[in-house]
Amino acid sequence: MGRISGLVPSRFLTLLAHLVIVITLFWSRESNIQACLPLKFTPEEYEKQDNQLVAALCLTLGLFAVELAGFLSGVSMFNSTQSLLSIAAHCSASVALSFFIFERWECTTYWYIFAFCSAFPAVTETALFIAVFGLKKKPF
């Protein structure tokens, strides 16, 4: 039981770290958008890239809501497999998004980070929701 109780705060902290970096990216997305564009770009091209990045960030926040709902409701709080997956994904996302912001990576890179570090844990969280509430299985 000691390992599981150690996973709970670790998972919560990595979720919050990823969330803080995504919110920071909302504030400082201009440099990343400019990295996606050629040296001379039109306002329409800028707005298109901005809309794509904002859509990706909004999807990420929606998936955070799914994960936090499952975690805080207790559905997956003590599931060690989901906790380890979530810790690995969100820790990786925190590091990758830090590089994304500071190194001004292209916007298409965000979709890879999104798929592996936000969507995959949210899908497994949804599967746990279905198992617990639909199939009436124990969450751990």
UniProtKB/Swiss-Prot annotation:
**What biological-process terms (Gene Ontology) are attached?**
cilium assembly; cilium organization; craniofacial suture morphogenesis; detection of nodal flow; determination of left/right symmetry; embryonic digit morphogenesis; neural tube patterning; non-motile cilium assembly
Q: Which residues form the signal peptide?
A: none
Where it sits in the cell: the answer is: Membrane; Cell projection, Cilium
The entry annotates sugar attachment on 79
Record has Iron as a keyword? no
Can you tell me where the transmembrane regions are? 7-27, 53-73, 83-103, 113-133
Q: What is its main location?
A: membrane
Which InterPro entries does the record match to this protein?
TMEM107 (IPR029248)
Question: How the protein assembles, per its UniProt entry?
Answer: Part of the tectonic-like complex (also named B9 complex). Interacts with TMEM237, TMEM231, MKS1 and TMEM216.
Could you tell me what this protein is called? Transmembrane protein 107
* Originating species: Rattus norvegicus (Rat)
- Upper taxonomic classification of the species? Eukaryota, Metazoa, Chordata, Craniata, Vertebrata
Q: Which gene encodes it?
A: Tmem107
